[in-house]
Amino acid sequence: MHGYLEDLAYIHDAGFRDYACSAAPGLERILASHGIVRGLVVDLGCGSGRWAGELVRAGYDVLGIDQSPAMIRLARKVAPRARFQVGSLWSVRLPPCDAVTSIGECLNYCFDPRAGRRALSVLFKRVYRVLEPGGILLCDFAGPHRSPHRKLRQHISAGRDWAVMASTLASGPHSIVRHIATYRRVGNRYRRREEVHRLRLFLSAEICNQLRRSGFRVRTLNGYGRFRFPRGIQGVLGIKPGPRTS
């Protein structure tokens, strides 16, 4: 199952890039506060590369990974000096690095059938192994308050050459389903496409416990610097113990 095909990827970048762009200054300050002012940052679920572009401008090397080929095509245009590859964050080979980020509830998406609580534990262990001592993992995720509590929630947005309608419904106590209809102008007509996204919701306590079991020291976050998370989004900072060597 794939998500963020060509039209939704375009719309997400055109109309919803603010999350990554607004979070970037706070994210950079967190990196710097832990002595990470250069080196390789791996961005899991990099989307259209807006955060990767900010990292490159700040002097970091960047590897962005996303399951959507359409997003990766956009990212290569947005941040041509970064490296990108198509892949699932649940299975892609991670290189040794100084920091790993996953911004915008990427850990919740169930495009890959391997996604889930057990896979999350494996992912955190993989990240811990590849991080340099003193390296960090920064991520945010959707929790139970992201659910509309079994009431249908609809959202409509539009731009110069696009429109999108998303309907979100709870699917059991720990997941939500989004039905997304996109309309994108192609020539003199609008093309309609549909996608269905399923997200598994996580409690902050279970994320923190899994990180600690993987070896991280853990801090919870309400946002990245001055950028505050919207309702239902929570963040964590995982720190690999040890002195930085670079």
Explain the meaning of each model-derived region.
Residues 98-118:
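A short SAM/SAH-binding and catalytic strip from SAM-dependent methyltransferases
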Residues 49-91:
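Class I SAM-dependent methyltransferase SAM/SAH-binding core
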Residues 138-209:
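SAM-dependent methyltransferase
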Residues 118-133:
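A short glycine-rich, Lys/Arg-flanked "PGG" loop and its adjoining helix->strand segment in the class I
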Residues 1-36, 38-45:
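Conserved class I S-adenosyl-L-methionine
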Residues 90-99:
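A short acidic, Gly/Pro-enriched loop at the edge of an enzyme's catalytic core
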Residues 204-246:
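C-terminal lobe and adjacent flexible extensions of AdoMet/dcAdoMet transferase-like proteins
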